[in-house]
């Protein structure tokens, strides 16, 4: 049996950020993941400068040998309508990354001990310690394994009744003659009913195309309409019948978060259901919650009772709680009025820049973690 101070299930941004912070305090940490890194992880993949600050990442160091695309603007429109709004910032407000590179970098940088390629079969308590697969033990457990995290299932049960987003994505080597999307300006196209959006994002030698929707049953049909729209408007010339789509699901913050805290256990990132409800982005909430979890664990000084860990639960509710739900785009207008209102709102430069981009996608007004 290998003993550690903290066991983290999940090596994505939430788990890596938590491990990195815990290692700075001298704790012996193991990260367990069923994947072998670098892993094939599709994601629109842009991060704000705040993420770099939170993790003390030097952009010049990170970009050595990795994709790091400066984003200085966006193009926003409605699927089925040719009119768009171009918003230019004149400076880098986000950076495009490839998750296969970014996640591997964070995990290696954490300096945690790694158990990769390990699908967890059992988690149980033995006195004051958690025992994982009868091979690893630790007094403190963090679940950061995404939507289907086994720690989340153990702590909170099935999330099947909670509203969730379903998404499909594909990442392709770029055909510069067949892609009209500019590298510094990702393109976002919303459904007329505001219940989903598609994106087209060029990053270095790759382009990521994806579509996400709250109403998951309508996802295949809506995705087909989006892809057809990209072809008819000349944004993408590639034959979509050859694309290998990857699907995933996640919970939105503010609807029905999973229980984040138990005795000697915390959830972080998508395992806790923290994706931003407006954009579906999960990278920044994952990293912030991982750092918050680590600080709570350190402050608990080895006494991991639920009441000692509850400050983390309060932080999660305050930063990612129900206040976000009211900003969901689909709630702004009644269903019967959505199409016309969508066209008017998303054809208004002020609304696109100040609300859709600054507030919902860039979270420019969000306070930095202390």
List the model feature ranges, each with a label.
Residues 23-43:
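Glycine-rich FAD pyrophosphate-binding loop
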Residues 122, 217-297:
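FAD/FMN-dependent oxidoreductases across multiple families
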Residues 46-105:
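A conserved beta-strand/loop capping segment in the N-terminal third of enzymes
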Residues 4-30:
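N-terminal Rossmann-like FAD-binding beta1-loop-alpha1 element of flavoenzymes
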Residues 295-370:
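C-terminal helical "tail/cap" subdomain of flavin- and related membrane-associated enzymes
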